[in-house]
Structure formats: C-alpha cells, structure tokens
C-alpha cells in the first residue's frame, strides 16, 4: 500500500470513529453560513421589504436553486459519493482523477445546455413558472430579466457541488460547509454597494447570486489542487463510472428532491395569491432552514458515507445502529427547534425584519407560514436521515415510489387548502404534512426491509425529551411576553430579549435533559 493510500485510509478511519465529531464540524461551519444567511435576509427585508420586485427575485432565484438541489446536490451526491468511494478503495489515484474529469464534463455539459435553453426561452418558460405575474407586465418582465441573470448560477454551483462532494468523500467537511457563506456575503454586499446604482434596486440581488457562483467555485479549487484532484472536464464516452452514476441518478432525481418540488409548487400557487405571498413564504422558509439546513443537512452529509461503508462491509448491526443514532439526534434537535419557532414566530420576525418596508401585516402573515413549516420540521429532518438508508444500499426505487406518494399528497392538499382560503399558510402546511408522510413511509420501508430496527431505550429517550421540551415551552411562554409589546421596543431591546430567550431556552432544555439522565455516551458515536 502506498503512503498516500495509507494516509487516506487513516483519515477515513479517524472520521469513522466519530460521526458526531464530523457532524459537529459540518454543522458548525454550516451554522456560520446560516447566520450570515439570516443577516442577508434581514438586509433584504429591511431594504426591499415584501414588494413586487422582491417577489420577482425570490421566485426567479428559486428556479435555479431548485434545479441545483435536484441535479447538483441531491441526486448527484447520492449517486456520485458511493461510486467515488469505490474508486478510492479499489483503484488508483489516476483512476479517481479520470472519474472526476469525466463526471465534470458530463455534468457540466448537461447543465450548460439547460442554462442556454432557459436563458434564450426565458419569456416563454416564465409563463407557467410565474403564472400569477402574467397580469402584471412590469412584474413579469422583471421576473424574466432576473431569471436570465440568475440562471447561469446553476452551472457554477453544479461544479462547486462536484468539488464539495469530492472534498466530503475525503473527509474534508469544513470547506464545502463554509462555502455557502460566500453567497450570503455577496448578496449583502450587492444590496448595499450595487443596488443604489440600478434602475430597479432588487436587480442587485440577482447579480449578487451570479457573482457568488463564481466566488464559491474559485474558493474550493485550491483545496482540490492540493489533493491533485482538480476537476478538469474531459469528455470520456462510455466511461464506466459515469454510466453507473447516471443509472443511480435517474430514479434518485425525483425521490431525493421531493421537498424541493413541494416548495416549488408552493411558490407557483403563491404567485396566484395576493402580493407579498411569495416573500412571506420565503422568509418563513429561511427561518425554518436554520435548524434544518444546519443540523439536518450535516447529518445527511456525514451519515451517507458511513452507511455506504457499513453496507459494503455487510455489517447490518452497525448499519442499523448508525441510523438509530441519527434518528435520536433528529428528535433531540428538531422537536425543541420546532417548538421555539412556533412559540416565537412573531417576536422573531419582528426582531429580524420589521421596519417601514416589512410591516406588521407582513410579520403576521409570515408568522403563519413559519409556524406551519415548523410543524413539519421533524419530518423534514427525518427524511434527511432515512433516505440515505436506502441510497447507501443502492436502492433508489423505494424512495422514488414513496416520493411520488408524498408529492401527490402535497399537490392534493395545496389545492384543498387553496380552495378553502388558507392562502400561503395552507401551502406551508401542505408541504409539512407531505414531508411527514414521506418520512413515515421511508421509516416503514426500512423496517420492512430489515435495514433498520429501533434500539433499546427509546421509551426512556422520549420521556426525557418530553420533560425537557415541556420545561422549554413553559420558559418561553412565561418569558416571551405579548408579541405586540415587541413592536414598541428598540432594536437593541428586541435583540437582547431574543438572546435571553434563546440562551435561556437552551440552558433550560440542557439542564432538564441532564437531570433526566441524559449523558454524553447517549449522543456520542
């Protein structure tokens, strides 16, 4: 065995010894990015509010981001990481480089073609995507312009996702996890520095997205160069690894991204509602993404390679133990996070977004959809854990069937809630219910296939969580006060009170958990 291969294996074994450590690194870097994202949303809300132009940007930006999560991150990662791991273990470093080059050429070629078509045909494509804007020519034209500006981001971020997948596979989790922070920095900078010079200030956000795509890709390349794995696109017709990745990707494209399809449907129907609906959904979704994007995604990133190795080693006991550990962490994090988002929805929105451009009505409307999204947080995070349980075993068909059921549930509920007049809150509720259905069916599938079983101690675990969350709810209820009182406070008073609620809530939650018997060994793996 070469020294290089020995170093790689040693790093992999070290990462394997502590899934919690790897998750913590990924989660902490992601948390930095999420806080910058929160700062970005505060800037956008305070500078642009919930205007027609803001609606146009959020919807235009959602299209390439949806495709990014569909192609570049979701299904691609599920297909690429297992094949790359196999090449690392069984083949030479040159073979790994050839695989990366071939994948870069194939993925880049497909995304480039899609981007060119969309940019040319944007006015036609925009008709169904922003159907609710068709009666407002100015808003529709702005959406088309923003779509053309933001769509090349898909190609840039797809290459960034490829680089990130390679880095994650080699145990270098921090760099890909911090990369999204550059998007937030670019958007904040564009809002302050570029917006004053444009005829429509919100266009600065679209240009900020494109600038961020370039920055994110350039940021990761030096780290790959150090590993001698810089992706130099090189077409390789019939490359065995690329063919296998495509085979795995096709069914995974739908299954792994059902939540994104649900959110896209929400935005489409929201465009039919009153002005501001798209923005209300956006801001509430962003706050819900704080716990989901920080902890849920971190778990998914770390768990997939671990489960893939367990399956390759035919170690069913360790496979199911890893899933059980991840599910316990989901409950540990998702339940209190959802509880806090529901109880503090309006104070949180007031503290972060309320000003002349984001009115009291905007706060009330966004709070409704935030609470609806929060109720599905456990389901959203559970999907992040359960889906890798199938993909690690190269079973892509079961998640697809389940995703189709969940999507049908979401579409049906969207229509029902829309007709019942629940507006944007109904759309958020439908997405949450569909996520819970998705998670429940994935769990049932894992149990039926014998790939997962609940370990001993779940009853005690749930009792501890019930006690801790009850204490947390009591603390928030007694200390938060009436939400309208927050409107009278200064910004510094709002921030201080929110910090006390968050810090005090975390302390109460942790103290009760420890008092109930939770120990480090219960969460460390």
Q: What residue ranges belong to the model's regions?
A:
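Membrane-embedded alpha-helical bundles of multi-pass transporters/translocases
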Residues: 2-525
